[in-house]
Amino acid sequence: MASKPQPIAAANWKCNGSESLLVPLIETLNAATFDHDVQCVVAPTFLHIPMTKARLTNPKFQIAAQNAITRSGAFTGEVSLQILKDYGISWVVLGHSERRLYYGETNEIVAEKVAQACAAGFHVIVCVGETNEEREAGRTAAVVLTQLAAVAQKLSKEAWSRVVIAYEPVWAIGTGKVATPQQAQEVHELLRRWVRSKLGTDIAAQLRILYGGSVTAKNARTLYQMRDINGFLVGGASLKPEFVEIIEATK
């Protein structure tokens, strides 16, 4: 097997957290040491970003935002890329299935956000994935490749060095269901093969593709053994000390 690119373990805390929950968790992350080359990213709520940034001193970890809009101005309730830059944030998660489902973010909206974020110097975790209905209808490939193609249409080849793809089967998020390693690998391989055919071997080889569907310490190691899985985007389990074990599984 060819060597994998540097793995990433990303924590998406979603709309969760309080100081009483997060401070002990951050202390656990600060105390963690890893004997392999892994990149760790934590995405708190917007309100918890300053506290997390101040308290999370382990140099292995970087802070991400869970969303952003491309412009500042009269957009009540939103946070722009420029505001995130002012706070020293260099990572952002875009296109999460919950943003697509609950806030009507289309492939085109997500693609424009990704392009603007890359142009502004951010590293971007771009989420793609299919619903249970789409999987049952045999449309997994069509759905995820359409999502990916919309992003690719907006990006230069140079911008891909800032992009990480996260495959999150919507049917496995927060449900306790998890894709088998073989199911996950099938989609990861499909995504990498598409990138190779459209953008070239070099971009495909260095692209990190994360798995993001009900990842736990119990299944992470087996999932990471798959050739095209380069790490994880973790939801619920990232709010527990278990996240350290998931990070350790990426070796």
Swiss-Prot record:
Its EC number is 5.3.1.1. Gene3D superfamilies: Aldolase class I. Pathway: Carbohydrate biosynthesis; gluconeogenesis; Carbohydrate degradation; glycolysis; D-glyceraldehyde 3-phosphate from glycerone phosphate: step 1/1. Pfam families: TIM. Substrate binds at residues 12, 14. One of its GO terms (biological process) is glycolytic process. GO terms for molecular function: triose-phosphate isomerase activity. GO terms for cellular component: cytosol; glycosome. Keywords: Gluconeogenesis, Glycolysis, Glycosome, Isomerase, Peroxisome. The keyword NAD does not apply. The active site is at 96 (electrophile), 168 (proton acceptor). It is found in: Glycosome. The keyword Isomerase applies. It catalyses: D-glyceraldehyde 3-phosphate = dihydroxyacetone phosphate. Homodimer. Belongs to the triosephosphate isomerase family. This is Triosephosphate isomerase, glycosomal. It comes from Trypanosoma cruzi. The lineage of its organism: Eukaryota, Discoba, Euglenozoa, Kinetoplastea, Metakinetoplastina.
